[in-house]
Amino acid sequence: HIAWYAIRDLARNRWGILYTAFFLVVTAGLFYMQAQSAKVAVSLMSVCLFLIPLVSSLFGTIYFYNSREFMELVLTQPVSRRTVFLGMYLGLAAALVGGFIVGVGIPSLVMGDWSNDQLVSILMLLTIGSFLTVIFLAISFLIAIIFDDRGKGLAAALGVWLFTALVYDGLVLLGAMTFSDYPLETPMLIA
């Protein structure tokens, strides 16, 4: 029941609607400019790798802080903490993943060409975007639990996003350039 509450709450939330509309407009615009689904998937992947962790981290942290009083009220009932936490997490994850899948999936269905390779690339994009949403949402909930202060929690969420989106990639590229004389195919695939 708590997950359904979170889904209904986010269905009315303007930020959730803007998140879905953003992916609808960007995906439709990319299909309008490029006819091949594989090229659109590559372009969308770069947008998703940058934007989904940011939105999931910040939105998850803000939502957790804003729902803290509601969760305290629900915990006065005979409900376990695990049930409340999982309900809030699964509801928020379902809403964000659903918004992403609708935002990317509808233009892909309508405007995409459906050869096997291009279908696989769009499905991979949807899968990776969904996993990114779920992972960074879990990290944002952990951050909101660790930090009671909203400002510190948001700063930590932004710091985690900054590290994973920019610093980690920079360190991998620096390592690749430093050890360019050595065969790095396998370590680069792992990193």
Segments from the language model and where they lie:
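Aromatic- and glycine-rich beta-strand/loop motifs that create alpha-glucan
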Residues: 1-20
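Transmembrane helix-loop junction
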Residues: 9, 66, 76-77, 108-112, ...
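Central hydrophobic cores of alpha-helical transmembrane segments
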Residues: 20-24, 154-164
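Secretory targeting signals
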Residues: 27-51, 91-157
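Long, hydrophobic alpha-helical segments
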Residues: 43-67
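Helix-loop-helix units of permease transmembrane domains in multi-pass membrane transporters
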Residues: 62-97
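A cytosolic-side transmembrane-helix exit/cap motif
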Residues: 63-68, 138-144, 172-181
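Terminal transmembrane helical anchor/hairpin motif
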Residues: 166-191
